[in-house]
UniProtKB/Swiss-Prot annotation:
Residues where ATP binds: S374, G375, K376, G377, T378, G379, K380, T381
Residues spanned by motif DEAD box: 482-485
Biased composition (Polar residues): 277-296
EC number: 3.6.4.13
One Pfam family here: DEAD
Domain Helicase C-terminal: 561-719
Residue ranges of every copy of the Helicase ATP-binding domain listed in the record: 361-534
Biased composition regions of type Low complexity, renumbered to the chain: 34-58, 125-160
Catalytic activity: ATP + H2O = ADP + phosphate + H(+)
Keywords, sorted A to Z: ATP-binding, Helicase, Hydrolase, Nucleotide-binding, RNA-binding
A GO CC annotation given for this chain: ribonucleoprotein complex
Motif (Q motif): 330-358
Full protein name: Putative ATP-dependent RNA helicase CG14443
Amino acid sequence: MCEKAKKLVIGNWKDNETDAEKVQKKPFLKGTKSSIWGSSASDISGQSRSLKSSSSVLSSKFVTKRLFTIQHGIEGQKPNFKIRSESFSGPHSAGGFSKSTRESRSKSRSMGNGKFRGKSHLRSSSESAHSSGSESSSSDSNSGSSSDSDSTTGSSSHGSDTGERPRMRSAVFRIHETWQSPNSFKAVKTSRENKESRSRSSSLPQKRFCPSKTQNDLTYGSPEPKSPSNRGRNSWRVGMRTPWKKSQSRSMSCSSIQKILVSRSFTRSRSPHRNTLCYQDQSKNPSRPSNYNTWKQPMDEVYNNAANYRKRHNITLTSWNMRNLPEPVLSFERSGFNATILQQLEDQGYDGPTPIQAQTWSIAKEGKNIVMISGKGTGKTLGYLLPGIMKMHNQRGLMQHKKGPIVLILVDCREAAVMVQREVLYYTNPLELRTHCLLGNSQWQGHAECDLLVASAGRLLQMIDNKKHVVELERCTYLVLDNIDRMIDVGLEGNICRLLCRLRPHAQLIVSSTSWSSNLKRMANKFLGQYTAIRVGEINNIGVRLQNIRQRVEVVNGLSKVERLMKELTAIYDTSDIPGKVVIYVKRQKVVEELVDLIRNCVPCEGIHGGRTAQENQGIIHDFGTGAYNIIVATQMTSNCLDVPGIRYVINYDFPDNIDKYVQRMSRTGCLSYNRNCEVISFFTMANYKLVTEVVDFLKICKQEIGPHLLQLAEEKMFGPRQRRRHRPQRYNRMH
């Protein structure tokens, strides 16, 4: 090859151009249409380029390029066009591709500067002999060879193709890389690709063929996300690349719908970079199963038994992950407890777990946080106690260097702590576990190392705040808050929050309550994290046993409540000499003392409240249970301590602040009294006017009789004009 030919391949024009070269170079200027796409084979051969021969004639070198198949020119002949840089020593073979040397490859990499885009010769193999004969003549005329399909000039497009073609970054891509053919999307592997491992080029990596977006994809695109602006459209559906027409919904047959499904383009994702998921016609391949069948939930025997059990006992589960919830324990043998605990359960005469126990035991063994919501007397104590004892028994040998209990149970009052401690001792003594009960007046024994601690919430939280007593909770991994709704009502929410911050980060929390109030929901979302709520009974906190209690709400004047109370007591004692036990609820301790002095003039009576010591209250409750007196006056604080059978009448002298407390008073007296003939009498005044609609709705749900005065107040609140408060003058700080 002559020096001029090598410079043409490299694309670096160092010699001065002659006038003939400038004239022949004009067809390559921007805006011209000198291209092989619009010319015949004879025109291509006539426009062949002739170069001056040099003294040192190089051997013929071919620069391999993609083989184009274009149907035009001589009839019945498919000319194969090749891009080559050749010497003019003689004819060459028309078939196959010749390999380029390492020198030509290294020189061709320097053509990426954009000065000359490598206008190479496209020659037909059928006219190679004619062109080789004219190679000996040293002509300075340059043929108007066609530019590449990837050229940036305006002449890069032929007559039928008017679209712009992408621009190649380097001459390496031009000589050794393949590009997309206008008639095909197949790539031809060149010798460059076959010997890719031998190449040590520092240029950009080879860009293999990747199917780009077609015109259909650009037209329809990926399904747009659903938003208020396109709510009525059908194109937001996931998996549909084209919108579904509403007219096709009913007027199309199954075969036509199947054809449309085959013709449509379904995708795995909205991302355009994901591969398409094609669906084939099932009629052509009947052995292949359908790919778009929906997943069916397994309906095995275990699942059916668990679902029927929950439906039969009205168990409602609420969790962050409903798929991994275990099935309820239907018998003691499947609970996973050791033989000692099973023997103790059999000795007490239990036949099987209660609904709240069956569902709580299976979830508590997995270490999840639980909220237990059920009425009084449903077995919540054993529901959280037995899993805690098993966890304490398994972790007893661990963390010997740390102090504090492994299981901590907090209750709302002293009497409840005594009851829980009695159950704890019955199951822990055979296992030789150390337990301790911290009551109201007892002192903290720092040297007493216990595995399980039962304490009243007020006393323990008071000792934590006191710097004289150091409460160690390093080993505590199981915390129970029994009757947390009562703790929140008393005002211990802030202290409970400080207690939870002192626990280990992975401690398991069990919360039990008789109601599901808004305060409890807020606290559970704040501290329990991904908890599971187990609810047994009606959603509106009304059990079947509460519906059997007769309820009567009387609208009275606040000044005449004492007279109305005496009339009710007189009517009760007139029916029988032994009418049954009566509990009167009030709000303040002062009112307790006043009513006790008034009623004591007629019949024996006593009162309990938080101002008295625990021994005094416990003695009064014991005498009330034995029958020393049948009337007792109590506050809301001590309502949980009245676990006495035989209570028949409950009088709400002061109506509670909300419906939840109203239900608690009934559940802790009427249901625990084991007396179905219990009656609840409530005095409703204008001070409770804001609760009138809730009270009426509650009575309607319980199917109770509603007085006309109460209905009138409810209608006035709902439909009457809104009453404004009287103007109260503001009090300013005056300087005297």
